[in-house]
């Protein structure tokens, strides 16, 4: 993952929270049950947590309230500024991304929501291989993101978006790197993880991978 999305992140920073609240009709289904999705990620995490894509701090706040020690990584300067306004003053967010980041001393869980699709499938594999080296046996990766059961599910979702006049959503689905469950299952298993997938809305699945 390079810096190609940083401009988008900065632009989106000031409207992101309205998106997750369902105020944009095109993305309402993408963010359906948003709070439940965040809670599910929190409940599946434990110990010292490395969070990629802090964004405006919504998941971070829930992790902190649940007593987790959190190390936050966020590439967008604008996102970091907004998150710092919402989070405890002593909490620090480090600039970085899924592939380039400062490694904390000890990590039990790696989490992210609505962000892993910014990596190509090859980059996803590189990232998971790196995380496998950071986690001990029993350590976890818990990612919530838009993925698809198979190619047919993806094709139908894009077609439906176009039929409903949701051209921005359709373009998003066709230009970013939304992957398929079999691809992610292979990536996780090849890097020493047992993984399960739980669907929480039409778009979003929670991937819970445990290091073997």
UniProtKB/Swiss-Prot annotation:
Principal EC category: transferase
Record keywords, A-Z: Methyltransferase, S-adenosyl-L-methionine, Transferase
Residues given in the record as S-adenosyl-L-methionine binding sites: 53, 74, 97
Record GO terms (molecular function): methyltransferase activity; S-adenosylmethionine-dependent methyltransferase activity
Pfam families: Methyltransf_25
Record InterPro entries: Methyltransf_25, SAM-dependent_MTases_sf, Uncharacterised_MeTfrase_YrrT
EC nos: 2.1.1.-
Top-level taxon in the UniProt lineage: Bacteria
GO process annotations (BP): methylation
HAMAP family: Methyltr_YrrT
UniProt family annotation: Belongs to the methyltransferase superfamily. YrrT family.
Name of the protein this chain belongs to: Uncharacterized methyltransferase BC_4369
Organism the protein comes from: Bacillus cereus (strain ATCC 14579 / DSM 31 / CCUG 7414 / JCM 2152 / NBRC 15305 / NCIMB 9373 / NCTC 2599 / NRRL B-3711)
């Amino acid at each position: 993952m390079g810096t190609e999305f940083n401009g988008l992140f900065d632009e989106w920073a000031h409207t992101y929270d309205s998106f997750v609240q369902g105020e944009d009709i095109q993305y309402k289904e993408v963010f359906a049950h948003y709070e439940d999705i965040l809670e599910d990620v929190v409940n599946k995490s434990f110990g010292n947590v490395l969070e990629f894509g802090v964004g405006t701090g919504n998941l971070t706040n829930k992790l902190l309230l649940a007593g987790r020690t959190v190390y936050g990584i966020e590439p967008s300067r604008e996102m970091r500024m907004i998150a710092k306004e919402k989070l405890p003053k002593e909490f620090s967010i480090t600039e970085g991304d899924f592939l380039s980041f400062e490694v904390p001393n000890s990590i039990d869980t790696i989490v992210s929501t609505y962000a892993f699709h910014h990596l190509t499938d090859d980059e996803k594999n590189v990232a998971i291989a790196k995380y496998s080296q950071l986690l001990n046996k029993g350590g976890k990766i818990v990612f919530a993101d838009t993925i698809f059961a198979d190619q047919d599910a993806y094709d139908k979702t894009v077609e439906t978006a176009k039929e409903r006049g949701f051209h921005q959503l359709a373009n998003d689905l066709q230009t970013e790197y939304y992957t398929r469950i079999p691809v992610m299952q292979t990536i996780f298993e090849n890097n020493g993880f047992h993984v399960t997938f739980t669907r929480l809305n039409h778009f979003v699945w929670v991937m819970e991978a445990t290091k073997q």
